[in-house]
From Swiss-Prot:
Intracellular or extracellular location(s): Cytoplasm
Top EC category: transferase
GO terms for MF: ATP binding; CCA tRNA nucleotidyltransferase activity; tRNA binding; tRNA-uracil-4 sulfurtransferase activity
Pathway, per record: Cofactor biosynthesis; thiamine diphosphate biosynthesis
The protein's name in its UniProt record: Probable tRNA sulfurtransferase
Species of provenance: Lachnospira eligens (strain ATCC 27750 / DSM 3376 / VPI C15-48 / C15-B4) (Eubacterium eligens)
Record family assignment: Belongs to the ThiI family.
Coiled-coil intervals, chain numbering: none
Amino acid sequence: MYKAFLIKYGEIGVKGKNRFIFEDALVRQIKFSLKDVEGEFDVRRADGRIYVNALADYDYDEVIESLTRVFGIVGICPVVQIEDNGFDDLANQVINYLDKAYKNKNLTFKVNARRTRKNYPMNSMEINMELGGRILDAFPEMKVDVHKPEVLLQVEIRGDVINIYSIEVPGPGGMPIGTAGKAMLLLSGGIDSPVAGYMVAKRGVQIEATYFHAPPYTSERAKQKVIDLAKIVSKYSGPITLNVVNFTDIQMAIYEKCPHDELTIIMRRYMMKIAEDLGKSSGCQGLVTGESIGQVASQTMASLYCTNEVCTMPVFRPVIGFDKQEIIDISEKIGSYETSIQPFEDCCTIFVAKHPVTKPNLNIIKQHETNLDGVIEELYKTAIETTEKIVIE
């Protein structure tokens, strides 16, 4: 029935002279989201709108599912597009549309007509009234409700084309990917970091990711789990380059030479350093973590202060003020929760002290890090140079 979809967007519409940049980015992201959907589609800007036109048979549910993952979209409207062949033809097309779209006609409705072509022989109010009358004649069981109608029939007269629609599927909102710079996500196998990546991507940030692998203490299953999480996030963010860093030797050196109650803090500081160096080499302008205040010992305010100190670029923590259940709710919504709870440990969960320090002193931490002098430099260089890069689309 539907050969086209009208794409509605929110914040993009107030971007002024730069609006076309955001619209073009949204068009690119829509095309990317549809690349694996069966069928052929033409995505284009026209008359201040974005349209997805189906050029071949397609699966409606699959198209809707793909488009609801595209940041920047606030609404997806399946539309019937007709040529302007006069009001009688329009009325017949509207009646045909309602007959096919709604099996149950015992509904309330409202007609909302809009014209960009002001030389149309009827004004919007006249169109509303005339179409409403024709609908009541065709379907006596339908009733008019101008306040809370069950069917809001939209009729848009744009040039020589008229859009007819009454269904609007909510989109995720946000901004198109790539319109707000690039950031490096520290991605673990937990619940929080995939959600953090999703949330910062929603604001238009292109995502790259770094995962710290510690074989043989962490398994290949743990690594595959993180790859699977990156694939889930990429459904929303677009392609992700996943940097897999072998962290075993650095972790062992910290374990052997530093106080055990400070292991997590010092380890996190080196993770941040490595992620920042990898990010700088690929054009990132910030780091993204899934840290939430007070959730674990390494995420107290004092601990975050210590880990932040090693960074020269900003660190974004999108879930920092969320309760755990709020984070879980988002992870279930985006489809990452079931993967995150698979029981495969990552390097953050091994060599954890029974009583880790919760109020670390930065000066003491830095003093204890000098125990690594003469050892850590070569290990750090090797970790960077041997990083495995996996492109996930």
